[in-house]
């Protein structure tokens, strides 16, 4: 397939992600991740040494203790290897009508299916990592049913716990189930906390509309179907594909994490397009795409994740 088709399809997907995904801000900045082939990637970690003692008695330039800067690359493998095939009516890829039809298909797929799967996986993965962190899971995973009387105190209390343990005060983001928005609206006038709704907020360069600000914490509302403690990844062979709630799944009411903690990596790979003259299966055009993705959190940043889960 010509490269310009792959570039166009990727652009369609990127635009839909930016417009509809609650987790697009989790994609790391350029240069943080490099692809090394297939499902393998490397993620950069920058570290420095701390302060030492200054020796005023030395005049040869050695009064300052030598510091070091290390930029190390750690290898990871993208665990999610997904794919899809679309069959379009008989259009020659060179016809002007083909690109219009293909764009509609790709955008609809990205907006309805791909965005939901990515959001669901990323939120669940963060919860899974926090729940598996033995050092903090007893205080960072809070069991509570959010109501008008406790919603603000529960989320604010969890944020304070996470801040103290992570030793980072600023830069946090909350993803809150949309069904709990009413609880915050009803509680907004009866609290000393500063709460506002309908804000436009930029998180890691991605702008979100209708964001709730709870003091200095941006809260993005997410459909409850994307916030589950257990998920099932469907194969697409005998079902509708995608990701759904797993057996005995509980609702995640709120997930808090630092904006630099999640590293969501994805790769639209092996895009193939077969026109009517090449396609031997039916009289039309076939578009096939392989999509690789995962989410990673450096071990030292696990303390910056917390969640409120329904009892």
Predicted features, each with a name:
Residues 239-245, 251, 258-311:
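Extended, compositionally biased alpha-helical segments that mediate assembly or anchoring
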Residues 93-165, 307-311:
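Alpha-helical scaffold segments that mediate packing/assembly in large oligomeric complexes
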């Amino acid at each position: 397939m010509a490269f310009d088709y792959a570039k166009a399809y990727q652009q369609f997907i990127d635009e839909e992600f930016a417009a509809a995904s609650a987790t697009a801000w989790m994609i790391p900045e350029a240069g943080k991740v490099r692809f090394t082939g297939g499902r393998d990637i490397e993620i950069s970690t920058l570290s420095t040494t701390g302060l030492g003692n200054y020796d005023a008695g030395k005049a040869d330039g050695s009064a300052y203790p030598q510091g070091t800067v290390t930029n190390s690359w750690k290898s990871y493998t993208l665990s999610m290897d997904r794919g899809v095939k679309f069959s379009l009516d008989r259009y020659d890829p060179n016809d002007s009508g083909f690109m219009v039809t293909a764009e509609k298909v790709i955008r609809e797929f990205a907006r309805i299916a791909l965005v939901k799967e990515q959001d669901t996986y990323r939120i669940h993965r963060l919860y899974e990592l926090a729940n598996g962190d033995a050092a903090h899971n007893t205080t960072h995973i809070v069991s509570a049913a959010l109501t008008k009387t406790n919603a603000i105190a529960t989320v604010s209390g969890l944020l304070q716990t996470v801040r103290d343990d992570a030793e980072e005060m600023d830069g946090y983001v909350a993803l809150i189930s949309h069904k709990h928005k009413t609880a915050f609206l009803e509680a907004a006038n009866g609290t000393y906390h500063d709460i506002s709704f309908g804000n436009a907020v930029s998180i890691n360069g991605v702008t979100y509309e209708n964001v709730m600000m709870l003091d200095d914490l941006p809260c993005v509302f997410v459909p409850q179907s994307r916030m589950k403690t257990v998920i099932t990844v469907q194969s697409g062979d005998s079902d509708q594909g995608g990701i759904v709630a797993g057996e005995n799944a509980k609702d995640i009411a709120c997930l808090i994490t630092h904006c630099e903690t999640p590293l969501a990596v994805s790769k639209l790979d092996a895009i193939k397009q077969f026109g009517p003259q090449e396609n031997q299966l039916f009289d039309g055009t076939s578009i096939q795409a392989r999509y690789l993705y995962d989410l990673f959190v450096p071990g030292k940043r696990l303390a910056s994740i917390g969640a409120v889960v329904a009892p």
